[in-house]
From Swiss-Prot:
GO terms for cellular component: chloroplast; cytoplasm. GO terms for biological process: L-tryptophan biosynthetic process. The gene is TSB2. It comes from Zea mays. The modification N6-(pyridoxal phosphate)lysine is found at K138. Coiled coil: none annotated. Pathway: Amino-acid biosynthesis; L-tryptophan biosynthesis; L-tryptophan from chorismate: step 5/5. It comes from the Eukaryota. Disulfide bonds: none annotated. The keyword Chloroplast applies. This is Tryptophan synthase beta chain 2, chloroplastic. It is an enzyme of class 4 (lyase). Pfam families: PALP. Residues 1-32 are annotated as: Disordered. Its cofactor is pyridoxal 5'-phosphate.
Amino acid sequence: PGPPPPAPEGRRRRGRGRNAAGQAVAAEASPAAVEMGNGAAAPGLQRPDAMGRFGRFGGKYVPETLMHALTELESAFHALATDDEFQKELDGILKDYVGRESPLYFAERLTEHYKRADGTGPLIYLKREDLNHTGAHKINNAVAQALLAKRLGKQRIIAETGAGQHGVATATVCRRFGLQCIIYMGAQDMERQALNVFRMRLLGAEVRAVHSGTATLKDATSEAIRDWVTNVETTHYILGSVAGPHPYPMMVREFHKVIGKETRRQAMDKWGGKPDVLVACVGGGSNAMGLFHEFVEDQDVRLVGLEAAGHGVDTDKHAATLTKGQVGVLHGSMSYLLQDDDGQVIEPHSISAGLDYPGVGPEHSFLKDIGRAEYDSVTDQEALDAFKRVSRLEGIIPALETSHALAYLEKLCPTLADGVRVVVNCSGRGDKDVHTASKYLDV
């Protein structure tokens, strides 16, 4: 689609304030930032406009050969959204095959760890997406898109994967529904996630190594899109995050919003209210959007996303797109992007393969610009420390992606009033990362 457009100048930042619970309070936002593409004011996060945009972000920057497939996909998605039979089938599979709903777990020892000397501190809960079949949140979307592909008559499925969890989830559902499965994965990611590569192949998927670029998630996504362009008539692309061209950001979010809906219901059951703070890691941003979306209109609920700072955001080894990026186009969508002055993509770095991506979902960019969500970053070492800390305190080995969110508790908890309820999305389990962590941690 050509080089990314230059980053806009003169963007006003939203003023912020905090109440005693550390929650965001309303402040002025740039009118341009909160206007949808059709000129209507956006009351937070809703559906994108007719062009697939959230404010200035999103859209369809794709070859003409893909436009029909995207239009067909959007039409099918909207039709199935009101199809009771489809919803019943999906709900049944999520319950009996995936194992939903996932628990909202009170992390008692982690809560105790962050208490102050006077015994006060926040209460920490984990949304246990790591307990889903295949070990992460990714299967929520994979199951739904596989069902959608069947309705479209597509028997060949392709997907990209970084950490391997989306690849495993896609391979799993393809076996469940008898579909052909091809997974694109960066050669570097295949080395650090060898266990997941074996799992995908055990499940009958063809895993194609991508050696171009840095041989990571960005390059795997590019190859998957090339495949789709070539085989669009027979193939459905199960994109694994809230990125890519419209309708994928909206559609993947809708398939993951079960995370936030369950969290709201479980919070009401457990303490008769809502969470005060929601925390999730952000690469492309699907697990965070799945948790956040339900609460975007609840202005008293604070939304915090954590990106990968790698070796530090002031080095050239990080993946902190929302912290350091500029607006550009990647993989069919306009969003914040790590790029140089010439609009060329800067290669990201993270110890976590799932966060090692130079872009981010357009809705996250929109939430950042309107000031509804806040984004920070966590270094490799901080994530490794949290990986070990949570394993030792709670007997839960989190994914390195999740560990970025858990690491932020070190910074967040001292700022919160007593009794503030924090929900961290435990987006995946860390079995896949034990080999990587063992190179850095002394246990």
